[in-house]
Amino acid sequence: MVPAFWGRRLPNFVVIDADGRRFEYHRDVVSGPTLLIAGGREAEVGRVAVAFRDTANILAFGEALECDGVRSIPDPDDNIRRALFQGEMTDPEVMLADANQRVVARVPLNGPGVAELRAALDALKRPSAQERRAMAPVMLLPNLLDPGLRDRLIQAFEQDNREGTVAILDAQGTPALVEMPDRKRRRDLTLDRRRPLYGDVRTAIAERLMPELWKAWWVDRLRPEAFYVASYEAGRGDFFAAHRDNSLPATANRRIAVSIELNDDYEGGGLVFPEYSDDRWRAPAGGGLAFSCSLLHEAVPVTAGCRYVLLAFLATPD
């Protein structure tokens, strides 16, 4: 089961701590992942603190605790805990949020589940910092689509797909969709707006991606033009040559392109933004890229296996 706020930024909260100082989550936790503990006794919280205080911020809700490396969050009415953990709890729990304060995991405080936190924290480790002198203006976010939804999308694609086409203007200036294997080669499925799968994808993007677009770029009030599942198969030599996603009158209202990886058991592939660098962008499975539809980009060939991807265009309202 996907925990509440998985892939979403936790809501902000403000408290006055035991020393009379104001603590604001979004303002004061400024680096690294966070473990949020609800319902634990001091000894239980202390064990978690010893294991993780060097790798994560640790917040404990409820009574004041004397544990090194733990910030106690006063919550006498249980309102903050209810907002973050979504309702009643029968046993103490711990939730892990990444450095962007988006939820990654939630497990019981006691028992084998805590071992999962070590693996989850290890997965959040970043590569060594680098000085960058050229980079495309692209947002890369993990955890946009959960594993169950990704599997459903791939299954739907395998049941119904067709050769991808390119939007053009013909000699008379009339819009047309044509196959151009020298420019684009892949298989596509357009999701049916009437099906629950479409609604589930729309909800995931609204809850997990749109707040980040607003935070980073002040992008708001866009609608999904359509959702597509596409495959790039190594055996077919699939690719999509460099192009822009809003270069025709019919696509001029597109603003943001979204590309979400549905699997990671392939080699090669990814996107290149040649106006800025030769770097190849590839999100983890379930994660994706968001970028302006005006950016020139190309989908490079997969060298082994098959890459499945969810594609979307966010456009201005009709």
Give the label of every model feature segment.
Residues M1-K125:
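Chalcogenol-based redox active-site neighborhoods
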Residues A60, L289-A290:
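Structural recognition of the beta-strand scaffold that forms the well-ordered cores
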Residues E88, A99, N110-G288, S294-D318:
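Fe(II)/2-oxoglutarate oxygenase catalytic core
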